[in-house]
Amino acid sequence: MADSSESFNIATSPRAGSRRDALTSSPGRDLPPFEDESEGMFGDGVVPEEEEDGEELIGDAMERDYRPISELDRYEVEGLDDEEDVEDLTASQREAAEQSMRMRDREMGRELGRMRRGLLYDSDEEEEDRPARKRRMAERAAEGAPEEDEEMIESIENLEDMKGHTVREWVSMAATRLEIYHRFKNFLRTHVDEHGHNVFKEKISDMCKENKESLPVNYEDLAAREHVLAYFLPEAPAEMLKIFDEAAKEVVLVMYPKYDRIAREIHVRISHLPLVEELRSLRQLHLNQLIRTSGVVTCCTGVLPQLSMVKYNCNKCNFILGPFFQSQNQEVRPGSCPECQSFGPFEINMEETVYQNYQRITIQESPGKVAAGRLPRSKDAILLADLVDSCKPGDEIELTGIYHNNYDGSLNTANGFPVFATVILANHITKKDDKVAVGELTDEDVKAIVALSKDERIGERIFASIAPSIYGHEDIKRGLALALFGGEAKNPGGKHKVRGDINVLLCGDPGTAKSQFLKYVEKVASRAVFTTGQGASAVGLTAYVQRHPVTKEWTLEAGALVLADRGVCLIDEFDKMNDQDRTSIHEAMEQQSISISKAGIVTSLQARCTVIAASNPIGGRYDPSLTFSENVDLTEPIVSRFDILCVVRDTVDPVQDEMLARFVVSSHIKHHPSSKDIANGDAAEFALPNTFGVEALPQEVLKKYIMYAKEKIRPKLNQMDQDKVAKMYSDLRKESMATGSIPITVRHIESMIRMAEAHARMHLRDYVVEDDVNMAIRVMLESFIDTQKFSVMRSMRKTFARYLAFRRDNNELLLFVLKQLIAEQVTYQRNRYGAQQDTIEVPEKDLVDKARQINIHNLSAFYDSDLFKMNKFTHDVKKKLIIQQF
């Protein structure tokens, strides 16, 4: 028996060798078949002589060979087990048996290969002709790799030469696939970083510790080591990734031989693909190629089981057919039963069928990247295996995958002609956050930002840079600037989350640029979603569940607050929302999450965003004789969730109105499209004067400054004056109870802390100092006093004058007091004479008395200041009058 098996191997292996040599470029490729080679090695005269004098098989003695011999006509009893019952093998037993047979055949082929090389080729000649092969064999031997298929490694010397084939055809060839397989396997084994550490040994170890099946591979590393593979990969990703997965699985099993019990497959995930395509730029030339795109997840299905390797039962004979490997494009079904030759029916064998996880998501272009007037495009993506649940609605992700097309009958019905739907088969997903944006800053940008932060008046410069095309409204600009920088979120012990975002509500008369402020923030913020209260429902703001029109499954769709995660959500016409819709954002504004429990989907989505809303008062105009809560149609729970309330009144002030008109006309002249004086529109914008009296920052610099500060600066509260905040809170509570205006709650303490952190972050400070606390108290007080009745507003300003005077020079305070005196005089003249005169006179003594109340005793500097003259005031020393001419 042993002899017969040896003769069988010797007879069959040359045929296998000749078949394998046909694929190789080895020196023996053009030689005749193996049988002919071995005959020619015994000399020219021997073979013809054997052919002539050979034994004649057909003759008279032919029947003697068929005579009965009792000893040889019986089978040997040893080794036979016919009497035992033979059971059917299970799938796992069969796989183990086939694995052992493959290993045995591999071992025998290896021994046979060594014999054949020694028989056919001279060793010296081989070393001269094939030095590369010997070097590669030595490297593999040093790595301890098995020597199987050594001939096949040399099948293609020049992988770049595709011999006129396309990349997909070239990669599909057996010899090319084997060369790619070995090159990638060698890359995984030997790639090291700049410190000499083995990169993938650590990655594989981490992957196996977490029982995962995804091995991330940096495309840039692959291109540096194996540029040919990096060239083939985007052109034929499906074929290349299949080879990569097989090579990665073998490398993993060498390190962890039994890991296939945990993960049946190992998937190579390609990251850092250099070219990023926009969703709206995907065309037919990208079909079946590896692409990288980004967007916001707007919709995702549940995790479904997808058939991976399916087996069928024949209902007539109960024979098990399969396994059939299912592809993404079509369903593979058996045609007929090989046992009973029937054509069905067949049903899926649930026990032996292998499934894999399947999830479908929809990604949409990020809100900040869509051009004005364009609708955001969206695209479906399929997540398989351990990629499922790696993202949820509202997450901004970078997606690397294969751009596929598939047949969609509903599209053909709708369009009337055959078209294909497109989908991205995901390979790698990365969640984007602010760190990615900061990575876009250059070293020069960082140096310029740090240098700017050392300017003593950087706070005023940033306030002046907010909406430079809008005149005045310093309190709104200050509040929006603090909201853009934001405070620091806290989550002590991972149990109770305290938000760090600052919410702002603008309320006031029509025509006071409320919507313009929102539009400006939309352009400056790195991620902003703009919506209106009239056009936004409760589910449009939060999230909703709907049934997919084609698949009929429930999907989770994200609303505006979820899409604005880690950004800004801008809501115009906030008062036009009905109460039911408005209450839906209570949780989003304070807990910064949205809980969903609909149609069997129970989940919680992140809504970590700043809410900036604008509303109009009841009746159209703000009535200063009423409190804030009486002027707006908003409930106390929603008002208390706003940190800063900005009340904008359209008061008649001839001097201010004239300055505003001059500013608007100047702005229109400088920003006209056909203006020849200034080529750059941004330069014209910054040339406009501002009421802060400092130079504003360019808008691009401001964006980078905010981006850097939000990501890199984490201000702490170690050195904060706690007593001052506590005293301020108790005073505000007392005044609130006395006046009956907006209620002061514990949320306002947190608001002051958030504003102090935002002011510290604005100056790139790591700790909150006293100046930050004073600015937070000033903004809080201005917000609180503006919401009072006009009758109590003046007394409250006098009560909190020392807090309101922070960061204001004496000239500003005196100008404010003088304007109040002028307004009183104008009211007196109208009531007495029925009309306002062109000249208003105020006794100097009245201004001196008011100035002493705020501890200002010397007014000469104020009389000489530009601020005094700019507002058309003159000082008559002889008459001791202050005169304003209109």
From Swiss-Prot:
Residues 47-58, 78-88 have a biased composition (Acidic residues). It comes from the Eukaryota. Residues 1-12 have a biased composition (Polar residues). This is DNA replication licensing factor mcm2. Early fractionation of eukaryotic MCM proteins yielded a variety of dimeric, trimeric and tetrameric complexes with unclear biological significance. Specifically a MCM467 subcomplex is shown to have in vitro helicase activity which is inhibited by the MCM2 subunit. The MCM2-7 hexamer is the proposed physiological active complex. The lineage of its organism: Eukaryota, Metazoa, Chordata, Craniata, Vertebrata. A motif (Arginine finger) lies at residues 640-643. It is found in: Nucleus; Chromosome. Residues 1-65, 77-104, 120-151 are annotated as: Disordered. One of its GO terms (biological process) is premeiotic DNA replication. The gene is mcm2. A zinc finger (C4-type) spans 314-340. GO terms for cellular component: chromatin; CMG complex; MCM complex; nucleus. It comes from Xenopus laevis (African clawed frog). Component of the mcm2-7 complex (RLF-M). The complex forms a toroidal hexameric ring with the proposed subunit order mcm2-mcm6-mcm4-mcm7-mcm3-mcm5. Component of the replisome complex. Component of the CMG helicase complex, composed of the mcm2-7 complex, the GINS complex and cdc45. The keyword Transit peptide does not apply. Belongs to the MCM family.
